[in-house]
Each structure stands twice: as structure tokens, then as C-alpha cells.
Amino acid sequence: MVVVSTRYEFSQHFDFPAAEAFSWCTDYDPKDHNLMGNKGYRKVTRVSDDTVILEDTLYPQGKAVTKKKLIKIDGERMTYFNFHLTGSNKNSLYFYRVIPEGDRKSRLEYTGYELTYPKRAPTKRQLAATAEADAATRTKKWGRLAKAMERELRGKRS
């Protein structure tokens, strides 16, 4: 079995204080995939104040793909971990940290430690291209989420 480990990272700016952005990011909902532009649904099970199990079903290329994820939330540090228990990225870990940028703005720092299981080992060039494409996809999705955050949180302030 071939196992490929890839690390990638990006950041996403938010026009909201860090605590408010962190709270929004960790408030999981069955409709989250719609916010990211995905066709799919999510089952959210709150195990404890700092632990959530997500069961996501998505439809890339029209075929159902289900992933189960363990989320660990550290509100004091404004960090959370997303560990994939099942699916094509089984045993992958994603780390999120919301950092204050003054009193009214913040940014999300994201690092993905992703495992994939291809039939054949990719070349270094293929690995680099995959990491770049994955980061671009996640950046695009987080851009959509930032816009959704803007709509929801600005609406609450009005």
C-alpha cells in the first residue's frame, strides 16, 4: 500500500474580532456544506463541550462519499483540530488557529497534514501540484465561508 503524506497551509482574513470568528468557525451545522459550495449533508454529534463528531456525505462526480471526522476544540487558545477517522483522507489531521489582528479583525491559519492512498507513488512534481491544488481549493472554500460569516454576523449586529 502506498501512503502519501502532504502538508499545506494558508490563511484567511476575517473582518471580525478573533473570539467572534472562532465561535462562528466552530459552530458546526448540517448546512455547512452549502456555505462551501458543496453538494452534501452533515450530521453533527456534540460529544462534549470541546468534542464534535462530523459525518459528512458529499457527491463529487455524482457519487456519494462519506467521511467521519473528530473535531477537538480549544476555545482558550482559539484552536481546533479536525482528524479524519474514515474516508479517502483517513488519518489526516487539519489544524486551525484564529489569531487576533487588532481589536476588530482576525485571521485563520490553516495547516493540513493530509494522507492519501494512491495506487502508485506520485512523483515529487505530482506531489507539489497536488498540494498546491488542495490549498487552492481550501482557500476558495474558506473564502466562501468568510463571506457567509460576513452575512450572518453582520445580520446579527443590525
Name each model-derived stretch.
Residues 17-20, 24, 133-141:
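Short amphipathic alpha-helical segments
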Residues 1-51:
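Hydrophobic ligand-binding cavity/cleft-lining segments
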Residues 84-140, 155:
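Beta-strand/loop substructures that line and gate deep hydrophobic ligand-binding cavities in soluble
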Residues 10-12, 42, 65-72, 82-84, ...:
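Hydrophobic/aromatic beta-strand elements that line small-molecule binding cavities or substrate pockets
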Residues 15-19, 46-49, 72-77, 97-107:
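A short, structured loop/turn motif at beta-sheet edges
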